[in-house]
Structure formats: structure tokens, C-alpha cells
């Protein structure tokens, strides 16, 4: 299936996701990914999401972030005027883009909808990481900060005037 996927679609990366069943049967997804990663010209990245094990739906956010960090993000070469923003379905994209452009002279890098593999490979070069929800972005924010020094903005929820102003100040302080 993986070889067929590559031949048919020529993706820039292939994520091999596990399931409850593969977790129970003990399939060697890592071994398959390692073998095919050596064979194909694109990264083949295992994503472990055996739902029976955790029973916590939000762990899927951390699992996807881990896969991106391990298989796609590259060490920084130079800083870019982008701010990583993880939100649901790129909600409020025009408004966030306008605010980031006008207030911070930076572009938002929305995660993950519509982001390319090339864009994701540069997350370590961006000015900061922000999120609309700690549950959604804590793993990514902490990992980028600890591994590459990209500040993770931790503020109160940006709802309401006080929350929104605190969020903007947190971004400003970080960059």
C-alpha cells in the first residue's frame, strides 16, 4: 500500500498511522517505515495512535506533532519572519494574518491544514509558536522551544479583551 501510494500520488512525505488493531496484533510499523524510508525518496514516518492504549482523544494531537517533529522538521538555518500558530481548521485565518502582519511584521504559519511539507520543515526557523488551546499545541510548542529555541507563548486563553491583549503581549515579548 505504501509503495502504491507513492507511485500513484508522489507525495512529499508518507505517514503510516497505526490503529487499535495494529496495536493489539503488534505489527512492526516502525520496521516497515524504516525499510521503505531507505527505499523511497520521501520520508516515511510511523505515527503510533493505538487508541485502546491511551483512551484519551487529545493524545492524537501530541502523536501527530511528534511525527512532524521527528520526520519533517529540520534544524534551523536562519530565522524567518513567521509565527507558528496551531488552531483548528485555520479558523479566523484572514484576521490572524492581518494582525500578525500589522502588529508583528510577520506571517502566520498555520498548522496543520494546508501546510506543505516544505513549510513544516522550517518550523524550527520561525519566531515563536502560539496556539489557541493548550491541549492542542503544548507538545509542539514545548518541543520546538526545547529542541530549537523557538519560544512557545504560554498565556491565558485569548478570549475577551484582557485575554486577547495578554496573548498579543505574550507574542510580542517572545519575538
What would you call each of these model-derived segments?
Residues 1-175:
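An N-terminal assembly and electron-transfer interface module characteristic of large anaerobic redox
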Amino acid at each position: 500500500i505504501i509503495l502504491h501510494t507513492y507511485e500513484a500520488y508522489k507525495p512529499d512525505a508518507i505517514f503510516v498511522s497505526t490503529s487499535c488493531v495494529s496495536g493489539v496484533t503488534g505489527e512492526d510499523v516502525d520496521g516497515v517505515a524504516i525499510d521503505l524510508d531507505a527505499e523511497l525518496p520521501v520520508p516515511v514516518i510511523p505515527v503510533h495512535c493505538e487508541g485502546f492504549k491511551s483512551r484519551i482523544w487529545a493524545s492524537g494531537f501530541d502523536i501527530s506533532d511528534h511525527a512532524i517533529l521527528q520526520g519533517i522538521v529540520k534544524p534551523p538555518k536562519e530565522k524567518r519572519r513567521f509565527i507558528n500558530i496551531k488552531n483548528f481548521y485555520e479558523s479566523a485565518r484572514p484576521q490572524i494574518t492581518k494582525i500578525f502582519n500589522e502588529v508583528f511584521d510577520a506571517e502566520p504559519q498555520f498548522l496543520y491544514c494546508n501546510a506543505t511539507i516544505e513549510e513544516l520543515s522550517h518550523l524550527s526557523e520561525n519566531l515563536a509558536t502560539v496556539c489557541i488551546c493548550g491541549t492542542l499545541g503544548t507538545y509542539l510548542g514545548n518541543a520546538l522551544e526545547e529542541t530549537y529555541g523557538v519560544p512557545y507563548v504560554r498565556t491565558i486563553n485569548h478570549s475577551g479583551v484582557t485575554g486577547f491583549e495578554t496573548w498579543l503581549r505574550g507574542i510580542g515579548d517572545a519575538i
